[in-house]
Each structure stands twice: as C-alpha cells, then as structure tokens.
Design a protein with these regions (language model features):
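N-terminal beta-alpha supersecondary unit
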Residues: 2-81, 110, 238
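Short Gly/Thr/Asp-enriched flexible loops that form oxyanion-binding sites at enzyme active sites
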Residues: 77-102, 120, 276-284
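A contiguous, well-structured pocket-lining segment that forms one wall/lid of small-molecule binding clefts
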Residues: 68, 184-266, 276-289, 316
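Conserved phosphate-binding catalytic cores of ATP/NTP-utilizing and phosphoryl-transfer enzymes
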Residues: 103, 108-130, 311
Length: 334
C-alpha cells in the first residue's frame, strides 16, 4: 500500500511516500534561513512558509516516488503536538487530499513518529526498547514496550535539550540554530575548562535550567554593555563544557533506564540525536554495558515526513483511522 506522510509541526515542511514500510521519497523544505535572523522560530512566519511550500513539496514527493494521488491508500499527517498554526496547514491539506480522493486519513503524534523513526532503516529492532527523544521541543525517556504502548520514564522539567543549546548559543552571540554550531565549536574546545553542573542526577527526569544559568553567569564575566562580548572569552571551551554536561546527563539517564527496566536496546530520536558527541558517547556507553544501540541516520533525526508516514501505516495495519473532523493540538501527551 502507498502512504503519503505530511509533517508541518514546526519549521520544516515535509512530505514523503512509503510503499508499505519502504521509503520511496522523503522531501524536506527547511525554514532555518528565514528564522535565523530572529534567533528562533517565529510561529506566524512558519505558518506562512508552510502555506507557500507544502503543495510543491507534496508534488515533489509524489513525483519522486512515481505515485499518483489516485494510487494512495492512506494519508497521514502530524496533528500534535507543535505550533498550532503550522499544524493546521499540514492537517488541513492532508484531510483535503483524503476527502477528495476518498482515502483513509490518520493523524499522527509527532513524538510517536520520532521514537519509531529508527525502524525505517532498522525494521528488526524488535520490542521492547528504551527511546531517548531529544530535540528542540522535547526531552524525554520512554520504555517502548510494543507498538502503541509507550511508558514515559522521565521528561524535562524546564528546557528541552535542543532549546538549551539555542539559548546558550544566543548567550555566546552564535547564530540560530545553536545545536550544530555549538557541536562544531565543542570539537576544538576543552570539556573540562569550565565546571558546570549536571542537573537532576536522581531519577529519570531532566533539568537544564541550572546548567543554562551557570553558563550565563560565566559569560557575564566577559560581557559589558558598551563593548559587548570580550574576545578573551573562549567560546570553544564554553561550548565543549556545556555540551559535555548535556551529553553526560542524557547518556547516564538513558543507560540507567535500560538497566533498570532490563531492556537490551536503546534508540535515540529527535534533532539532537544528530549531535556527534551524543552519538559517540552513547555508542561507548552501550558497548560498555552490553546494550544494543540503534541510531537513525541524520535525515531521520530531524523532523521529516517518512517517520509520519510509517507511523500512520502501522496504525492503519491495526485497523485504525482518524475522523476528518480531527483538529490539531499544540500539546498532547503520548
């Protein structure tokens, strides 16, 4: 069967076509350049860009897959959580395609799509596994017991990890998005140059606000109202020290969750899963503890529609479908 997936939860306009669980096309149009000058995603601009780009992206996905609208057996779209205006664009388009072609429609939870994304390239993952969902809007640990059964073990109490990266990048006068920039600078810095805290060491919840405050306090020593940021501040060392603190926390809690639940497989999902230090450290920790680590390739870490199509396809196989009066929701627990 052919599934069209649509993703517009934040600032990526994406469409993909799958034949069963095989990706035939996966198109992503990023808005990063548009939001860069504002230091973050502007919801109104994001919605307008989705309106402008979605149909061309859908057409490209269908053309690349050599699939016509009349051949589609299912349309799936992210309906929660995310920016409400952005979600509305994708959900409305998906429902229109479904209604006009009398095609089943399924609304997909963005978080569920992320924690299933690794199955695109690794269909043999099996269950159960521990999923670390880590991105600009989410940081949470799930015990994925089987498809459709996800037990949250812990989540962030304040900033998501990706959000903390963006805020620290702003403190250092670095461009948005901050994650890739800090990751790159960190490779040339010393991770032990600055003593930074590791938040909420007990349990499975996360906290990055204390870490962010510690970085702000350090950077403030090198900033003046008149001259701005002092060139003596070593941004590479700050980046490396900050990244080490984040990665230490993510790795330790994820491995602890696997050991606590007796789970032998870990999956990392979300945009921050593309971070080079996180991938390296998690590989080392997994090998040390005899745990299988499954890492999606970069194209399936970022927001994409292939993971949405896969999730919709799996729900459809269970006989599920959504009503056409389904509304997008800005927040929704998994």
């Amino acid at each position: 069967m052919y599934t069209l997936g649509i993703e517009t939860s934040c600032d990526e306009t994406a469409a993909a076509v799958l034949r069963d669980a095989t990706v035939l096309s996966n198109i992503v149009s990023s808005q990063t350049k548009i939001h860069e000058k504002y230091g973050g995603v502007v919801p109104e601009l994001a919605s307008r860009e989705h309106l402008k780009n979605l149909l061309p992206v859908v057409r490209e996905a269908l053309a690349q897959a050599s699939v016509g609208v009349k051949q589609l057996d299912l349309v799936a779209a992210t309906h929660a959580p995310g920016l409400i205006g952005a979600l509305l664009v994708g959900v409305s388009a998906a429902k229109a395609i479904a209604f006009s072609g009398k095609i089943p429609f399924i609304g997909v939870h963005h978080g569920e799509a992320h924690i299933l994304a690794a199955q695109i390239e690794h269909p043999d993952i099996g269950y159960p596994y521990i999923a670390l969902l880590v991105s600009g809007g989410h940081t949470a640990l799930y015990h994925v017991q089987e498809f459709g059964s996800y037990r949250m073990l812990g989540q962030t109490r304040d900033d998501a990890a990706g959000e903390a990266y963006d805020k620290v990048a702003k403190l250092l006068d670095l461009p948005y998005p901050g994650g890739p920039v800090i990751d790159r600078l960190a490779q040339e810095g010393s991770s032990s140059a600055i003593a930074l805290p590791r938040g909420m060491q007990e349990g499975f919840d996360f906290s990055f606000s204390g870490l962010k405050t510690a970085v702000r306090t350090h950077v403030a020593l090198f900033r003046s109202k008149d001259a701005g940021l002092d060139p003596k501040l070593n941004r590479k060392d700050v980046s490396a020290s900050f990244q080490a603190a984040v990665v230490d926390t993510l790795v330790e809690k994820t491995v602890h969750a696997a050991k606590e639940t007796g789970t032998k497989t870990i999956v990392i999902a979300g945009g921050v899963a593309a971070n080079s230090s996180l991938r390296k450290r998690m590989r080392e920790a997994a090998e040390k503890h005899g745990i299988r680590l499954v890492l999606p390739s970069m194209q399936y870490c970022i927001d994409n529609a292939a993971m949405v199509a896969l999730t919709g396809y799996l729900h459809h196989k269970r006989g599920e479908r959504s009503r056409l009066d389904l509304n997008p929701r800005p927040s929704m627990a998994l």
